[in-house]
């Protein structure tokens, strides 16, 4: 279980309130598929994933990225109980989709990079530390069903 300080919660929620879920979600998922091409096997139905430009411009990637980040936002509302908040998604990704849980860590790290690029100097070292803690906690919660 991850325990967030009041300061970490403030940093996470403060930045989250400024995040364009559609834009950041699409970019994060797109970058995951470009940087870690083996993750594309989970998205066969998305059509053309043949190049970085095809992936980043793919409307299905963008739409699913928004869906992923929307679910991520729900976890932010439940920082004190990520495991419970993400239990159904953990079950779905384990039992039905058979996603390698390592991919949750990869996507979390990509998300931090995308946030840093979008928020520049506002994304301080303290902000990064809080978000790294969050994405690690989300990855652990999503991996729970696998154990």
From Swiss-Prot:
Binding-site residues for heme b, renumbered to this chain: 64, 93
Domain Globin: start-end pairs: 3-147
Expressed in which tissues: High expression in yolk sac blood islands, fetal liver, and embryonic erythrocytes. Very low levels in adult liver and spleen.
Domain of life: Eukaryota
Bridged cysteine pairs (disulfide): none
GO cellular component term, pick one: hemoglobin complex
SUPFAM superfamilies tied to this protein: Globin-like
Cited function: Hemoglobin epsilon chain is a beta-type chain found in early embryos.
Name the record gives this protein: Hemoglobin subunit epsilon-Y2
Annotated source species: Mus musculus (Mouse)
